[in-house]
C-alpha cells in the first residue's frame, strides 16, 4: 500500500475513479445533476492538472487526491475500495504536503466527506452556493484548525 506521485499514465484510471465517484458526493442533494466527465469539465480538470496529484497504488490505483499549496482540491476513492483506509492514507499524505492552514471545499450534504475531514480537525468556516455542470449546489469551505 503506497501513496505515490501521479504519472501521466494514471490519467485514464483517475478519470475512471472520478466517473465512478463524482455523483456520490451529490447523492443527498434534491436537485438533479448530469455527470460531466472530468476531462470535459473546464473548471475542475485544469484545477486538477495544475495541482500536485497523488494516487493510492496497491497493485492497482484505488484512489487519488490533489493539493495545490494549502488547498486540498480532490480526494476520490473508487467505490469498491471505500472504507479500507485508502481515503485516510491519501488525506494524511496531502496534509503533510499542504502544511498548516489546509483548506478544502465540499458539497454541504456530502456527509461522508464531512465526517472524514472533521475527524482530522477540519471545521466549516463558510457556506456558499456554487454549481456542478450548471446546476446550483450548496457547498462548504472547511479549514484545518490548529
Spans of model-derived segments:
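Conserved beta-strand in the GNAT
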Residues: 55, 59-76
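A short helix-loop-beta-strand connector motif used in the catalytic cores of GNAT acetyltransferases and
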Residues: 42-55, 71
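Conserved GNAT-fold acetyl-CoA-binding loop/helix
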Residues: 15-44
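A short, internal acetyl-CoA/4′-phosphopantetheine-binding micro-motif in the GNAT/acyltransferase core
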Residues: 72-82, 106-107
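Conserved acetyl-CoA pyrophosphate-binding loop and the N-cap/start of the following alpha-helix
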Residues: 80-81, 85-94
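Conserved active-site alpha-helix within GNAT-family acetyltransferase domains
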Residues: 88, 109-126, 135-138
Amino acid at each position: 500500500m503506497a501513496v505515490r506521485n501521479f504519472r501521466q499514465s494514471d490519467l485514464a484510471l483517475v478519470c475512471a475513479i472520478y466517473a465512478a465517484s463524482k455523483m456520490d458526493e451529490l447523492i443527498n442533494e434534491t436537485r438533479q445533476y448530469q455527470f460531466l466527465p472530468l476531462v470535459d469539465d473546464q473548471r475542475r480538470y485544469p484545477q486538477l492538472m495544475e495541482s500536485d496529484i497523488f494516487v493510492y497504488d496497491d497493485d492497482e490505483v484505488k484512489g487519488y487526491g490533489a493539493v495545490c499549496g494549502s488547498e486540498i482540491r480532490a480526494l476520490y476513492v473508487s467505490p469498491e475500495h471505500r472504507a479500507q483506509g485508502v481515503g485516510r492514507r491519501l488525506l494524511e499524505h496531502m496534509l503533510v504536503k499542504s502544511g498548516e492552514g489546509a483548506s478544502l471545499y465540499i458539497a454541504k450534504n456530502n456527509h461522508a466527506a464531512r465526517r472524514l475531514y472533521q475527524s482530522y480537525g477540519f471545521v466549516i468556516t463558510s457556506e456558499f452556493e456554487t454549481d456542478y455542470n450548471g446546476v446550483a449546489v450548496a457547498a462548504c469551505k472547511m479549514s484545518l484548525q490548529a
